[in-house]
Amino acid sequence: MNQRKGTTIVPFSFFNMSTDQNLNKIASLLDDLLSEEPAYFCVNMRIKPTNNIKVFLDGDEGLPIAKCVQFNRKLYKLIEESGLYPDGDFSLEVSSPGVDEPLKLIRQYKKNIGRALHITFADDSVKEGVLEAVAEADIVLAHTTGKGKKAVTEQLVIPFNNIKSATVQIKF
């Protein structure tokens, strides 16, 4: 996994060199677009063998659909102008990762402070709790055991390298 100015690039393992090069070029074009609007950032990007480019963006205050459309149009134009796909044989999808996708970047954790998380650890054990704080190397999770008067809440400091996945839990 490459990290570039807040952009996470996760290429498929069977990519050929030109696909990797295209992915890096598109990431560079996207970085330039995102530098104009620093409240938004790239979470993930991939290119399918059919030249279907999928870009997953997020924002510190969320990502409105209108912004997805705006980024899609601008990035599509930049890709066309770059000549990466001279025959125009590509498609582009720009969207948010979705609520069921695991958090990947520290910025995502920070924007979800105060929300319930479901964390799977490297050993496949699980904890749920409220995200209270985020630092460079770890998070603080308020984990409650028991119910009612017997409920006990403890603050767990969890290093990022112990987290296999963390997803936001939507409570209704």
Feature locations, PLM:
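A short linear hydrophobic-aromatic micro-motif
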Residues: 39-45, 128
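Ordered, soluble secondary-structure elements with a strong preference for glycine-centered loop motifs
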Residues: 20-24, 62-69
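Short, charge-patterned binding micro-sites
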Residues: 43-62, 85-100
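Short secondary-structure junctions
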Residues: 31-41, 83-87
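Conserved RNA-binding domains used in RNP assembly and mRNA/RNA metabolism
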Residues: 80, 117, 121-128, 132-172
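Short boundary/loop segments of OB/S1/cold-shock single-stranded nucleic-acid-binding domains
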Residues: 101-122
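N-terminal presequence-like segments and adjacent domain-start helices
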Residues: 1-27
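Helix-adjacent hinge/juxtasegments
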Residues: 66-69, 73-106
